[in-house]
Amino acid sequence: ASSIRDRIDKLEKEARAAKRLFEENDDEAYKTAVSSLYSRLRATWERALEDIVFANVVMRHRDYIDTKNLKRVTALEEADVQIFQNGFKKCCDFVDAHDPSRGHDPEPPEPSEVMADIKSLKDWSEKLRSKMNGVS
């Protein structure tokens, strides 16, 4: 599995490729690319929750709980939770995994917004990792 940083790097590259489609007015290809990107962004938010917030204490598909990093979880604050929820929810709005409700089939965000959403995850994960590393 890729690290959070590697995943974010790939997402940034995908966003730059999608931006070219946007600039070429290839609306259908851009919409497809952005939907795919937000699906991976959503998965990266999930992985960051597991790896950073829960400090690998609890991991999917592992049959034990590793309590040695449990204290690090205390660095999580309400603002961190809000940023996570906002970023994750936005991803859910743009992925094909969910059938859009009638009247709610949003246009994909413009490239600058896509990059801002990736940056939100990047900033959140780096800030939280730093806070958690400060827990002794």
Where are these regions (language model features)?
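Long, charged low-complexity segments
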Residues: 1-25, 32, 36-136
